[in-house]
């Protein structure tokens, strides 16, 4: 799907106080950035930000970083963030997830959220999927020993692919469901904009939680 360009989005991001512009220099120093030692949770491909905004509201003792590579999408999250002046535990980064190890040190991230990621349907692009073994290797380097990767999607082929990739990457499935909203795991679920739209149409939402243990 081609994203609609938002005029002035790059300029808005460049001047915004809620966007971290020197993210690579913060590697290993995110606790200093937030001014506390609270756990750090990240959402990769956060879209318009509804999910991570609500997480930050509900959990003031957790620090959140929303990662989005498209300026035209990130500006919508910024608009929401600017309505929450009193919130001190949420910032954004505009970057490609491929370079995630340049931004976070070993064990620096407590949890990773992946919501409705690009399915990259062509086989030759499988490595680009955020639940490929390639990306799980990246997550392995930045995630704390007891950390989790939580993934939601309405795309069944992508979900089936992900279920195969987790053990192949040396990780373990803690739980998974093909219909989150009618499962025991739905309690406390926060919906993204996309999730709310398609769930209302009757589309089942798949979710998995994966973990690994540092050797």
Where do the language-model regions lie?
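A short glycine-rich, Lys/Arg-flanked "PGG" loop and its adjoining helix->strand segment in the class I
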Residues: 131-145
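S-adenosyl-L-methionine
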Residues: 1-40, 50-57, 79-106
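Class I S-adenosyl-L-methionine
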Residues: 164, 169-215
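Conserved SAM/SAH-binding beta-strand->alpha-helix loop
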Residues: 70
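A short acidic, Gly/Pro-enriched loop at the edge of an enzyme's catalytic core
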Residues: 102-111, 116
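Conserved beta-strand signature within the Rossmann-like core of class I S-adenosyl-L-methionine
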Residues: 146-153
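Class I SAM-dependent methyltransferase "Motif I" SAM/SAH-binding loop
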Residues: 44-48
